């Protein structure tokens, strides 16, 4: 999967967090070189602070992890669009 567009679905914050966590939990299974996630638009902002959480527990920490691979696990990093 290359692009996961889930914007403008009026998702609640917990739902946005769940989408981000699901991608984080399965990060090693995505083989496309430049995957994209869009959970912006009419959706709520993900919870938390955009930072390296070890382990991540909030939506923005999951986003940080999949965008940066701070533990250098070697998975393909994502481009993520979300509401702040």
Task: Go through the PLM ranges and name each one.
Residues 2-3, 7-84:
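N-terminal capping/linker segments that flank leucine-rich repeat
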């Amino acid at each position: 999967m290359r692009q996961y567009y889930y914007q403008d679905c009026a998702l609640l914050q917990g739902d946005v967090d769940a989408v981000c966590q699901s991608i984080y939990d399965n990060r090693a299974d995505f083989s496309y070189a430049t995957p994209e996630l869009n959970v912006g638009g009419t959706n709520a902002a993900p919870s938390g602070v955009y930072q390296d959480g070890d382990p991540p527990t909030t939506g923005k920490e999951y986003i940080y992890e999949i965008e940066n691979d701070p533990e250098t696990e070697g998975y393909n990093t994502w481009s993520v669009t979300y509401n702040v």
